Amino acid sequence: MSLYDINGNEILTGGTGGSSQSELQRKFKDKDIVWIGDSIHAYTQPDGVTIPYLFQYNTGAKCYNWCQGGTTMALMDIANYDAFSGVGMVDCLTSRDFTNQETHMSDRGFTTQVAEMKAFDFSKADYVIIELGTNDNIKLVDLDNEDDPLDTHTTGGALRYMIKKLLTYNPKLNIAVCNIQDGVEGRRNEGLELVYVSKDRNEIIKSVCDKLNIPLIDIFYLLGLNDYTSSTLLSDGLHRTHEGKLKQAKVIERQMNYYF
């Protein structure tokens, strides 16, 4: 079966990168997988598809892509972003109270997704894949708070909070967390060249996952982003080209197949 983008052009899916499609489908076909993340998994540019869509195409899983551009793991006290942050998303999905999301869904362009979230029985989810932290870097969110490990205004505290909430809601839920890539020189934040300290934030993400025995999908290394590959994998110094989406989907497929 061929896959086509929004312009009717055939899309090459690039296979499954070492995991046979039949093996992936035996494991993930018809499984409900919720994706909580940022624009890296939300954007359809430039090819009309997303990374979760490619994962669904290769595995037969039912992927619910509730990723939102610009969102952080942590809260930032900005109402229309916090509603769709990692913390905000987990709160509404586990409490079934979507008041904050409904308040801000129009100005964030998330009306369809909120309707889908409300209609979905989250207790039936098989997996949650968390892909957040890049915007925590860009927006200079604090890494962690030694005095309060559940400080939801830090990346580490927010991730602990999310995992705690999800597993308290459903102890059988399978969770995987993606770490983050390096940025590319030249992206700017408030007129200043952005120093992308992915290593420090990834250490916090890894520490939380290690402590809680949550599988970590190592995007930082396995995507293979460097000075020689950035023009192939990235369209704007951050978001993925079609080739970059194919590779990231393969990485996630392989890692999910390994862990689960």
Q: What annotation goes with each model-predicted range?
A:
Residues 1-22:
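Short, low-complexity N-terminal tether/leader segments at secretion or assembly junctions of large
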Residues 26-33:
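A short, charged/proline- and glycine-enriched loop
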Residues 32, 40-149:
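Conserved SGNH/GDSL esterase-like catalytic core that processes O-acyl groups on lipids
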Residues 36-37, 178:
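Short hydrophobic segments within beta-strands
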Residues 51, 116, 155-162, 201-205, ...:
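A general structural detector for well-ordered alpha-helical segments in enzyme core domains, enriched
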Residues 78-84, 180-260:
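Catalytic His-Asp segment of secreted/periplasmic serine-dependent ester chemistry enzymes
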Residues 131-138, 163-200:
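Active-site segments of SGNH/GDSL-like serine hydrolases
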